[in-house]
Amino acid sequence: NVEPIIGATIKVKGSKENAITDIDGNFSIAANPGQTLVVNYIGFSQLETKVANNMKLTLSEDRQTLNDVVVVGYGVQKKSVVTASIAKVSADDLAGTAPVRVDNALKGLASGVTVTSASGQPGAASQVRIRGIGTINDSNPLYIVDGMPIEGGIDYLNPSDIESIEVLKDAASGAIYGTRAANGVILVTTKGGEKGKVRVNYNFSYGWQNPWKHRDVLNATEYAVMMNEGLVNAGQAPIYDDPYSFGKGTDWQDEIFNDNAGVMSHEVNMSGASDRVNYYLSLGYFHQDGIVGGNYDRSNYSRLTMRSNTTYTVFDAQKERSLFNKLSVGVNLSYARVSNKSIDANSQWGSPLGSALYLSPILTPTVSGAEADAQASLYGSQYMLYDKQGRMFTIPGSSYQEMNNPLAMLSLPGDNNWSHKFVANFSGDLNIGYGLKYRISYGADLSFWGADGYTPLY
């Protein structure tokens, strides 16, 4: 059926001349004989043709993307026959982003999916919202990994172990997963082996992180001048006799930022397949230091992952009979140990970053013994903190309220959060015939977590 196309774009190749078809599919454009017209329209293949008078152009449908196979929750189908709203992210897409976590990998790769970072901590979880906020109390989507619902997020997965991610965005997913799918469904399929020789891969990557910018703050001289001016304007005497003697003083941001914070990843996997067995084994380690406190071992994220995907074909008689002709069983096992150390984040009062922006640049990170002796009331406590060189950390004093020396804060042991997660999925597939398949599966999802904290003496 040949029908007019409204809004198709026509351009003269190599020039700025262009036109758009009207409601009847007609167009007119200034072009010379021998030039080439380029016609584009969404859903149709691009057409290039030589210029002629009274041309009649016909576009053909672009079926290339319609042949892609997508997971829909109850099997796999071609995009050309799927009516639900599905976005797909392939392993090649993930390889181009090198994400820390799987949920971070969806940023900018799936339409209708909003991914925002909850904080700047290393390995921090992201908020994933599919087509907006679903409910007041819980807007997180349902995660399905290899057909098994997973609780508590999917940060236990190594992004390199993933074959594809499908995002089910409309109400059709509710017919499969019920009310749990009210906020959308994210289907994750992990990798398997391919027939041929055994493949062993090792990947290593190392990168650096730096703060995007430093806040523009006063140096010590500018600070002293401003303080004197404020006191004079208030009718009081200035407190600094020679503001210019302080020089630049201390930029506390330079003191606490961990420039060139490292990001490291090791991954090794082995895969293969025969007529009977399909297997994929992997081991991965990831470590990321924080740009604040990472050099004090106070802010970092580590993840150790192990995975084993195995499928065994018990019998395959598809050539001999049409009913009950194939039986296969599969075992997917995964383990992850995640640990992270963090500092106070998004806190105006008392956090290392908040203190670094608030403290006077006249103060120094440490004090000499003579200075400490001269202020015995301030430095006479038995709980004083010292740096690695044995120098006493400066105490800002009572005028700074909850602000503390950020270097002293970072020198203390921090909180260490850790978790162990075991996920096992056992399945069996029987081909009944006539396109019907019977599948039975059993899964176990075990998580153990805890935290080691430290409270300093006062």
Which sequence ranges carry the predicted segments?
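Surface-exposed loop/interface segments of Gram-negative outer-membrane beta-barrel transport/assembly proteins
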Residues: 80, 194-249, 293-301, 305, ...
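Short, small/polar-rich motifs associated with maturation and membrane association
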Residues: 1-329, 423
